[in-house]
């Protein structure tokens, strides 16, 4: 992936592009028969643009570090737009695919509050889907918007180590095939815990745990561990 922060009309802005590669195995029961399928390849490309509307002036390098060191109480309001592009591997005659064969637009608004070593954040997001006119076996897939609300809290130690926890809910996303609605409206809940450790002044190590569950008939129940390096320049 690629992330770049820059100044735009005297505001702090950021562009992010990610191109995932996936390998997975799905297990299920079809007409009473246990079934397993595997997929491997490129998934859809993700692009995101974000800008701060209030707070956090556009600074770089030492000026930004000095500002962060001197600012102990601050409120930041930001907005973003993410787009999922239909670039991933997609087979019309298969029900499970790595690509979605449709665009997904995600407008987002968030509020971040820093109070000394504590940080609090709340974010609202809408997921808006275009139609997939080449759905499984030549059908048309439509889907209602899916709405999420997330909140998190973070504490940063003097050493630069930080820990955080968060939770969120998601509602909506009912779909229809050829105009016939399906009983698959989602009611999801998830939580996460993560920690970061500085390696150098511009490189850090991050580990996180995610868990999701669903309250409706359809949804995803998962447990995920993520480990990565985060760099800045």
Pin down the residues of each PLM region.
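Transmembrane beta-barrel architecture of outer-membrane proteins
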Residues: 1, 42-46, 102-106, 146-148, ...
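N-terminal low-complexity, intrinsically disordered segments
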Residues: 1-8, 12-14
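Residues on the lipid-exposed face of transmembrane beta-strands in outer-membrane beta-barrel proteins
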Residues: 1-4, 47-53, 81, 107-113, ...
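Generic structural signal for well-ordered secondary structure
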Residues: 10, 38-42, 206, 222
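Repeated loop/turn-to-beta-strand initiation elements of outer-membrane beta-barrel proteins
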Residues: 10-13, 56-59, 117-120, 160-163, ...
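Outer-membrane pore/translocation modules
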Residues: 14, 20-142
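Outer membrane beta-barrel transmembrane domains
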Residues: 132-233
């Amino acid at each position: 992936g690629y992330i770049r922060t820059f100044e735009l009309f005297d505001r702090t802005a950021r562009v992010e592009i990610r191109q995932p590669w996936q390998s997975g195995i799905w297990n299920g029961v079809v007409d009473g028969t246990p079934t397993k399928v595997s997929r491997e390849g490129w998934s859809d490309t993700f692009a995101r643009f974000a800008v701060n509307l209030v707070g956090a002036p556009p600074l770089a390098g030492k000026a930004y570090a000095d500002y962060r060191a001197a600012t102990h109480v601050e409120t930041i309001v930001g907005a973003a737009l993410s787009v999922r592009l239909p670039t991933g591997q997609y087979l019309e005659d298969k029900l499970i695919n790595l690509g979605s064969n449709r665009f997904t637009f995600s407008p987002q608004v968030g509020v971040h509050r820093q109070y000394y070593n504590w940080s609090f954040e709340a974010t609202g997001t809408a997921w808006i889907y275009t139609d997939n006119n080449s759905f499984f076996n030549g059908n048309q897939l439509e889907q209602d918007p899916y709405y999420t609300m997330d909140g998190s809290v973070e504490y940063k130690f003097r050493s630069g180590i930080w820990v955080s926890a968060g939770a969120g809910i998601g509602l909506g996303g009912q779909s229809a095939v050829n105009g016939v609605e399906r009983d698959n409206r989602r009611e999801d809940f998830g939580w996460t815990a993560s920690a970061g450790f500085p390696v150098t002044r511009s490189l850090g190590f991050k580990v996180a745990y995610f868990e999701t569950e669903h309250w409706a008939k359809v949804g995803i129940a998962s447990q995920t561990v993520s480990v990565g390096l985060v760099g800045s320049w």
